[in-house]
Design a protein with these regions (language model features):
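Nucleotide/phosphate-binding catalytic cleft detector across ATP-hydrolyzing
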Residues: 1-8, 12-119, 129-311
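Glycine-rich anion/phosphate-binding loop at the beta-strand->alpha-helix junction
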Residues: 124-128
Length: 311
């Protein structure tokens, strides 16, 4: 049995051999079925699936996206089952399948960490999940999670720098930023040494290199400058101020939820786990679970299915 998480940008797979992550942007007509075909060992292979890619703007509404993903997966794995926000498995496209990946993670971890707050910080978003409130989490849509502070649209790679940073201070001068798509989270985190070029798995805004010099040039454009105008230190100031804002936003929300739950226990998964676990004095699930923590929903839905005897 394999676990599959179909996101808007990434396809994550967990099987007996480990974790497999493919950059697979649905808005560019990503070949989900072709990517999955390589993991088929027999026609009767079982697969359990979660998704969040139904929100991609190539679909006119969520049910269109859900149906597309279900059909694409079933072409590779005809017996696939899909986990929903009702904490149940389904064999057909239903509304409950929309953005249920975070709930699978919660369902898997709640027994071992019943009083913890889970932060899953990925390429695009941060899921903030109070495991102590699992019963209240069922049925929550992304809209409701945004309204409750359980979903923050900022991650380690794909977010527009200007979305969090309307202005920066350069040499003591407050400088508005351009809202153009010039630089992303990955550029700031690469410049600050939080990630490596190999971790920069998404496309760059300018479709150019994924290295320090290229990231610094993209960061300079956020203030409508060439790198020569503001220098390396100026670009690093932009990166540092972005990180400060992102850290305040995400860590502040996590601490608020933990306080409401009366707990000091915080566990962290995803590509940003090492960084945010340090900031929050939390437990890095990469150390507890290994590489599967970077594809936690795919791993979790597989474990839930095995634990529940669904197959």
């Amino acid at each position: 049995m394999i676990g599959i998480d179909v996101g808007g940008a990434n396809l994550k797979i967990v099987d007996d051999l480990g974790v497999h992550i493919h950059y697979c942007p649905l808005w560019e007509h990503a070949p989900i079925t072709a990517q999955l075909d390589q993991y088929i060992s027999s026609p009767d292979d079982e697969a359990v699936v979660v998704m969040s890619g139904e929100l991609a703007d190539c679909f006119s509404h969520k049910m269109e996206g859900i149906s597309f993903i279900v059909d694409a997966v079933k072409k590779a794995f005809p017996h696939a089952r899909f986990y929903g926000t009702d904490d149940l498995f389904h064999t057909k496209a239903v509304p409950q399948l929309a953005a249920a990946n975070w709930l699978a993670s919660a369902a898997y971890l709640k027994e071992k960490y019943p009083d913890a707050v889970l932060l899953d910080i990925g390429s695009t978003t941060a899921d903030l999940i109070p495991l102590c409130r699992f019963a209240d989490l069922k049925g929550l849509t992304d809209l409701k999670r945004l309204q409750n502070g359980y979903l923050v649209y900022s991650g380690m790679l794909r977010g527009n720098i200007a979305a969090l940073l309307p202005s920066v201070v350069l040499d003591g001068i407050t400088t508005p930023t351009s809202s153009e798509y010039f630089a992303i989270s990955a550029d700031a985190h690469l410049a600050l040494g939080h990630i490596t070029p190999a971790d920069y798995t998404c496309d760059t805004p300018d479709r150019k290199e994924k290295n320090l010099d290229a990231s610094l040039k993209r960061l300079a454009r956020v203030v409508c400058a060439d790198l020569e105008e503001i220098g390396k230190q100026g670009a690093l100031q932009i990166a540092a101020q972005f990180w400060e804002r992102q850290r305040e936003l995400i860590c502040g929300q996590v601490r608020r939820i933990a306080k409401e739950c009366g707990t000091g226990k915080i566990i962290v998964a995803g590509i940003g786990a090492p960084l945010f676990a340090r900031e929050l004095n939390g437990t890095d699930l990469n150390r507890k679970l290994g590489a599967v923590a970077q594809a936690l929903p795919a791993f979790a839905v597989r474990e839930i299915a095995k634990r529940g005897g669904y197959f």
